[in-house]
């Protein structure tokens, strides 16, 4: 049995070799010759999985080590009798921590406290719900918009998108990409919505590029109307709008979810799904795969204020490290994908052990996802 895996899926060879012969291939594009004798295909979001890719092949299972599935034609896979699995929630923590890194940088630069701002979260799934929990742990007011969940009667105080635009100082998008239907998200942030954003608002998109109309966003920025923008995803990719990149506050190469933990979760989730598909279910303990963190222990004295939190967050991950490289290579063919392929290892907050002499600080850091303990420092 031959299993094709994206060459940028960490631990893929190590895990899938338990099930068969493994061949690592580029994700964009998948070499057609490699598909000829393959039984299974494991991809990331850069690979379009559809009839054009798989017609006439013997692929019986496709796994995507991503939470999103808009790059996969699931209808075709069902029609062709091909098994399928995604990795929902695998990188949710990573995306939340990306958003925090960006917000804390902007807060320091512009001199505001997060607790003085209202954050509107559009899409309250794996990412949005975790972002809400961490923001509220800090005492930040959040407003939630998720029409599918609201229509299902899920618990939660869901608002309309118009309400969020009116009330929120920060608007952050965490939806799937639906190009049509009752919950269409293509250009959810369209020209009209972008025009209504508060002067000085912050707009964040770390889900899918076309959720925000990039042309309309550029037009507002070119008009000189005050707006801070954080974009990790673009319309289109990989050939992003260079003029838009020049005007946003933070621009990165679709790497918000790229922690080592997030990538490893994606790989292990599709590995476990494929082993189940084969009738030989196996489970993997994530901790057995991950290397030791860069920092052993940090000692924190006193209460946790915003500047201290910013230092801890940026010790693990400072979003500016990914902004500068994209600006250097913007517009150069192939460089967007190279940034993603050669991405520097990044860890999650849980990899940082913080020893606190303040009990409340330890409790708050634990709620935020740090590996924190209370231990009076003598």
UniProtKB/Swiss-Prot annotation:
NCBIfam families in alphabetical order: PRK00257.1, PRK15438.1
GO biological-process terms attached to the record? 'de novo' pyridoxal 5'-phosphate biosynthetic process; pyridoxine biosynthetic process
**Mind giving the lineage of the organism this protein is from?**
Bacteria, Pseudomonadati, Pseudomonadota, Gammaproteobacteria, Enterobacterales
> What task does this protein carry out?
Catalyzes the oxidation of erythronate-4-phosphate to 3-hydroxy-2-oxo-4-phosphonooxybutanoate.
User: Which residues take part in binding NAD(+)?
Assistant: 146, 175, 232, 257
PROSITE patterns reported in the protein's UniProt record = D_2_HYDROXYACID_DH_1, D_2_HYDROXYACID_DH_3
Top EC class, one word: oxidoreductase
Q: Which family does it belong to?
A: Belongs to the D-isomer specific 2-hydroxyacid dehydrogenase family. PdxB subfamily.
Q: Which GO terms describe its molecular function?
A: 4-phosphoerythronate dehydrogenase activity; NAD binding; protein dimerization activity
Pathway info: Cofactor biosynthesis; pyridoxine 5'-phosphate biosynthesis; pyridoxine 5'-phosphate from D-erythrose 4-phosphate: step 2/5
Record key words, sorted: Cytoplasm, NAD, Oxidoreductase, Pyridoxine biosynthesis
Name assigned to this protein: Erythronate-4-phosphate dehydrogenase
- Annotated substrate binding lies at 45, 66, 258
> Pfam families given for it?
2-Hacid_dh, 2-Hacid_dh_C, DUF3410
